[in-house]
A protein has these predicted regions:
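Glycine-rich loop-to-alpha-helix module at the N-terminal edge of alpha/beta enzyme cores
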Residues: 45-104
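Terminal low-complexity tails and localization/encapsulation signals of metabolic enzymes
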Residues: 1-47, 80, 84
Length: 104
């Protein structure tokens, strides 16, 4: 993939394009990867981790471990976290839209 000619080359924050999975706070790759392509052009946009059963199990276990701490938060604390996430989505809306539409 040549990022100079990719539709994703215009991202204001290239760090938003992740090709691994976030599991338990750690970016996890895989032994194999597969291409995500722009269906309009056939151009490869990125090579992403081809995760399997072990990674799925790790993600489920991490979510299970995180649940008690989330459950213990007050509605106000949860709301503040969700509002922070919403603000980040708004802040990066243009780049996120480019990433999402490039692979559609």
């Amino acid at each position: 993939m040549d990022m100079k000619t990719s539709p994703l080359a215009t991202l204001a924050d290239a760090a938003l394009l992740k090709t691994d999975a976030l599991i338990d706070g750690v970016w996890v790759g895989a032994a194999t990867r597969f291409a995500v392509t722009d269906p309009a052009t056939g151009q490869a946009l990125a090579q992403v981790a081809n995760l399997g059963d072990a990674e799925a199990e790790a993600a489920i276990a991490a979510a299970d471990r995180a649940w008690p701490a989330w459950r213990a938060k007050t509605a106000k604390e949860r709301g503040a976290i969700l509002m922070q996430w919403f603000r980040l989505l708004q802040q990066h809306a243009d780049d996120l839209a480019r990433i999402m539409t490039a692979e559609q």
